[in-house]
């Protein structure tokens, strides 16, 4: 077993590739979740689109990382932005919209060009619409299928950098060096690690933001 650990998986289908790596529990009903939880000491999940109720149920029996609250925050773009603002971490101007009229008002406030995104489930450029002119408002809202969305303004930037951090059970934090990401058509195509030409002050600034964020969630 990798690192001496026995792996267990909770999946929706018997065809899930996790079945090649360890015992797999199929379905997400209460009985299966209980069996999975009873058989697991520590649990983590693959993506922010995981059902919060499943994480809540598993947490009753097992240690789950990241926490249920972390999942609740990160699977909704509006809640993410609100938290960043509360922690004084800079982010693009934004506004939640639930109708064409709200989108029109948001554009008046934020300006164009801007990006309209679904508040949930979007990834790799999916669930997004680049609005360049007011003539595209109806088309953009139709692209969202009437779902709650978030309008984000553009910001000028030189490059995109990411930081990964880990926290121990004792609360200690460790940070990886910053990495540089390159996207094409909304999809991450290349990550260079470590990023080049990074000053110590920039690394420390990113670590400061991460410290505030990770201790909050």
Map each language-model feature to its residues.
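Structural detector of well-ordered beta-strand residues that form the stable sheet scaffold
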Residues: 8, 44, 64-66, 92, ...
